[in-house]
C-alpha cells in the first residue's frame, strides 16, 4: 500500500510520539562538520562558520594548526604611500589599496601590522621585539575569531570545538576561553552528545621543522592513553587527533633532509622520495581502541579517507593559501559512522 506524502508525515509524527512515550530518544545521529589546518586564513574561517549553517550541522570541529605563520608590516612612508614586503613587494597609494592588501594578507593566512619607518627599523634590529609582536597579534586574532564564532553560532545553536596543532604555540591556545558555543577542547575529552565522547589532541610526532608542539612518540602515546582512560564508552569514542596514524595513506609527504635548514626534499632516481609521516603511537591507539572515527589533518596534501579495522580515518586536507576550505561532513550514530562526505568550498 502506497501512502500519500501527507499520511506519511502524519505516521512519522505518530511514531515520534510513540518513541517519546517509550522514553526512546528522537535523535538517532549527530551531524559533524570537520575542518583543519586553517593556518590563520580569515577567508577559510569565514567559510567554516558558513558551513555550520549551510550543512545544518549540530557540531563544528576545528582541528589544529589554526594560527598563521608570518607577519607582514605595512609601512607608512610618510609621503602618503605605504610599502609592504609581500609577494615581491608592494607600494600602495590610498586607503582602498591598503584595505585590499589587508584582506589579501589575512585571507592567505598571514597577519598584517601597520607601523612607521622608524618602528620598522626597530623591528629589523630586534628579533625579540618581532617575536613578541607576532605572538600578541596571533593571540588577539584568535580571540577575535572566537568572538565572531560565538556571535554567529549562538544564532544556530551549534557548538564549535577547537584544538591547536603542532604549529600552534601552547600559550596562544591556552588564551582561548570557553564561550557558550565555542569550546577550547585542546588536550581534553569532551562529551559532544548523549552517546559520544571526543578525544582531542593537537600534538605531532617530530617534524623536520621543529614546531612548537612536536613531541616524541613516547609522549604522544602517554598523552593519548591518559585521555582515552577517562572515556566511559570506548565503543562510541571519537578521536580528533591532529597527526594521522602512520602509513595509513593519509600521511604521505615528500621525505626531507633535516640535516640542513631549511630542510630540502630527498630525491632518488630523479624523483622525490615519498614516505608516511604519521605517528606510530596514534596508529597503535587506533588499532587498540577502535574509535568510530579519527578526525586528523597535519598533512595538507593527503586528503582522503581510509579504515583501520572498524575505524574510519578522515583527513580533509587543506588548501588554506587559496582560501579554499576543505572539510568533511560526518554523521555518527550508536557505535558507528552512518555516512560521511568530503567537501570543498
Residues covered by each model-derived region:
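Binuclear metal-dependent phosphoesterase catalytic core
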Residues: 40, 189-195, 211, 215, ...
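Beta-strand-turn-beta hairpins that frame and shape the catalytic cleft
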Residues: 25-32, 189-200, 235-238, 306-313
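Core catalytic region of metal-dependent phosphoesterases/phosphodiesterases
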Residues: 44-193
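Active-site environment of divalent metal-dependent phosphoester hydrolases
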Residues: 39-43, 66-71, 162-173, 190, ...
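Active-site-proximal segments of metal-dependent phosphoesterases and phosphodiesterases across multiple
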Residues: 128-140, 238-290
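Binuclear metal-dependent hydrolase catalytic cores centered on His/Asp/Glu-rich metal-binding motifs
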Residues: 194-237, 257-258, 272-278
